[in-house]
């Protein structure tokens, strides 16, 4: 059995395994994965907002207990960010193509950046309410997902299906954690301050986090970079149009 101090590190590193597999198996998504993963890793620095109110995991060098920060959160966020952004496209064989400039000027997109920033606006507004900080985080990502669908209806399917896929993906990882380290959830999560509802040993809030993270993050790259998704074969045909022909 893994010592408690290294369980969080082991679990965070486990998320890098599918990341590496997808990165090398599907090179067309490498740019997206790198950019989204690096951006998501920054959110690992928000860990002091959740320790010890939401959970209090033993960490390398006891960093979380001493400062609230930890290295594991950076690894974890990096791993889930890249996979969450491309999981739908990998499984449905979709690629990204840029949106034409005239389409960007349509009235539908006038709140483009506000929609993208909506989670960053929502979270601090809700954080100071008398509830556990995990709930404003969940609500903020849900608001971001709704804003994405309103601003970019073409991403609706990717948002909904991507959210469901990521929740299932995260569920498998968490179930492995609970199976390999029984009692870890009760030891680390602040169950009395949250719902206390466990589904196969997994806190309900973790599944809500996974669902809303997947909903927002599955389309964040396309939304931010002004891309849409198309079937891979269509993307290939569009690229071939620009290849020189033999005389």
Where are these regions (language model features)?
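Hydrophobic transmembrane alpha-helical segments in integral membrane proteins
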Residues: 1-15
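Short aromatic-rich membrane-water interface segments that cap or initiate transmembrane helices
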Residues: 2-5, 62-79, 193-208
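Hydrophobic cores of alpha-helical transmembrane segments in multi-pass inner/ER membrane proteins
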Residues: 12-20, 74-90, 140-147, 205-221
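Membrane-interface helix-boundary motifs at transmembrane edges
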Residues: 23-36, 97-105, 150-159
């Amino acid at each position: 059995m893994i010592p408690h101090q290294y369980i969080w590190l082991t679990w965070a590193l486990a998320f890098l395994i599918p990341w590496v597999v997808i990165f090398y198996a599907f090179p067309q998504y490498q740019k997206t994965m790198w950019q989204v993963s690096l951006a998501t890793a920054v959110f690992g620095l928000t860990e002091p907002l959740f320790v010890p109110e939401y959970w209090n995991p033993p960490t390398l060098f006891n960093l979380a207990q001493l400062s609230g920060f930890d290295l594991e959160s950076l690894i974890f966020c990096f791993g889930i960010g890249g996979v969450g952004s491309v999981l739908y496209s990998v499984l449905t064989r979709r690629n990204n193509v840029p949106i034409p400039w005239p389409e960007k000027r349509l009235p539908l997109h006038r709140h483009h950046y506000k929609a993208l920033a909506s989670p960053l606006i929502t979270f601090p507004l809700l954080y100071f309410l008398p509830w556990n900080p995990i709930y404003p985080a969940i609500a903020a990502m849900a608001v971001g997902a709704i804003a994405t669908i309103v601003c970019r209806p073409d991403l609706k399917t990717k948002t909904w299906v991507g959210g469901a896929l990521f929740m299932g993906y995260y569920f498998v990882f968490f179930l492995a954690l609970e199976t390999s380290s029984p009692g870890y959830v009760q030891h680390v999560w602040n169950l009395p301050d949250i719902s206390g509802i466990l589904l196969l040993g997994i806190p309900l809030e973790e599944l809500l986090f996974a669902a809303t993270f997947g909903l927002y993050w599955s389309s964040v790259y396309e939304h931010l970079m002004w891309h849409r998704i198309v079937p891979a074969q269509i993307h290939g045909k569009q690229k071939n149009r620009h290849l020189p022909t033999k005389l």
